[in-house]
Amino acid sequence: MKPEDLSALLSAVLTDAVDAGDLPAALREGITPARVKVERPRSREHGDWATNVALQLGKKAGMAPRDLAGLVAERLTGKPGIAAVDVAGPGFLNVTLDAASAGALAREIVEAGPEYGRNDTLAGHTVNMEFVSANPTGPLHIGHTRWAALGDAIARLLRASGADVTAEYYVNDAGNQMNVFADSVLARLHGRDVPAGGYPGAYVQELADAVALEHPDVRELTDEAARPVVREAAYRLQMQDIKDTLAAFDVHFDVFTSEQTLHDSGAIDQAVQRLREQGHIEDREGAVWLKTTDFGDDKDRVLIRANGEPTYFAADAAYYLHKRDRGFEEKVYLLGADHHGYVNRLKAIAAAAGDDPATNIEILIGQLISVNGAKLSKRAGNIIELKDLVEWLGRDALRYDLARYPADSPLTIDPELLRSATNDNPVYYVQYAHARASGAARTAQAHGVDRSEFDAALLTHATESELLAQLAEFPAVVAAAARLREPHRVTRHLEVIAGAYHSWYAACRIVPMPTDDGTPRPVETLNRTRLWLNDATAQVLANGLGLLGVSAPEKM
């Protein structure tokens, strides 16, 4: 029995009491399964699960919470799967499951396989998840590494919770930066220094060499004639490098949207016209302004300059409407720490478009990241490249560590820790638990222990109860992590599961202990049932790691 199953049972008991007239009808709205919360008590002596539902409903029921708890306990006692119900303190309910009910979860998990933990709490939600969106003028760096790991993990969690998700990369390929980029590559083609304000780094020379291979005669052209050729080729080659780097990091996008296409297709002019028709545009000082102060921004924003050129903000507005027109109910932006000023203006765009800024747009601002002892990349112009971090620390360690902390907390990566094969290294600790469970299954098979029998009532050891309880909470953790956009909830829970597994592994044998003279003892139902629990744990660990883009090794 999982916590959500117990919540549903408690809800049914309370509903029956209302129907019988023992509780007032006014309680009905507050006793849905979603509102009846259960949690693991701090002390095992207080049962398997606890709830404060009587404390929450006592006043509305016109009863002392302890009396209400007693009524619920009386009705809950004797229900299938319930071993004991105790009232504690001012009205807490402590529930102990019978071993068969708790242990049945092991078989349920094994039979569900990769589907265990997936849920439908966000079914019907259409989500556009935009992240990374680095300029195509250089390699991905350390900051992009964090947004890639977090954004991809959030997208995986949303999908696991039933949402229809599109992972999107917005390519900032318009504006003067692309001209500066092209001029930098062009300068290197001719052996010149990059222009003032240009892009340094050996990667620019590499791009120049690659462009020359594609276009052998490019050096014979004038700069004016060569510039569009160089710009197109260097942009395409750099974007391919970005895509290859992301793929090596196991981060995948469904859509790459070009900012330039918004200009070329007339989408920006159309967006301005739509906003004008809705009454949110003002012409003054020769420019076109969006009245964002009407929606909480600190000042109005220019869309079209007096010289007729659209601003970057105009592209932002057109891009938001582009997402909206594609049917996305929720637009999630994962932006860097230098984008705090974008929050109000993006929400103003949403409001001006007729959306609810509280529900239709979500802006996650990530904080800075640093790495102790990292070497700056001369190739990239004294930055730390994503591909170098992956090569140095390993994809799994890096992705896990980046997902382990809230996006809005500054993070310093400890390479020595992440490269260590010790229990102090969180990713090693979790992956080792999976490898240990996989190894235990191989050992069991070699000794004739299989899953041909299962008796959940035999899983009575205290470590088995704890392990089952943590496995039972996994689906709710996944749902909460998706709803709150917080992958770190999954990492922390996996560490709890790993700890519970290691304790169980030390206390309970799957393969029977031989006699003192080495004679093998016969395999019993308990041994086979424990193999189910072992394999269930391996499955949950693999499922959780997969949601983070981290592998689940079978050997370490």
Curated annotation (Swiss-Prot):
InterPro entries for the chain: aa-tRNA-synth_I_CS, Arg-tRNA-ligase, Arg-tRNA-synth_N, Arg-tRNA-synth_N_sf, ArgRS_core, DALR_anticod-bd, Rossmann-like_a/b/a_fold, tRNAsynth_Ia_anticodon-bd
EC assignment: 6.1.1.19
Motif ('HIGH' region): 134-144
Keyword Nucleotide-binding: yes
GO cellular component, one term: cytoplasm
Matches recorded under SUPFAM superfamilies: Anticodon-binding domain of a subclass of class I aminoacyl-tRNA synthetases (SSF47323), Arginyl-tRNA synthetase (ArgRS), N-terminal 'additional' domain (SSF55190), Nucleotidylyl transferase (SSF52374)
Keyword Protein transport part of the UniProt annotation: no
Locations listed in the record: Cytoplasm
NCBIfam families: argS
HAMAP family per record: Arg_tRNA_synth
Name of this chain's protein: Arginine--tRNA ligase
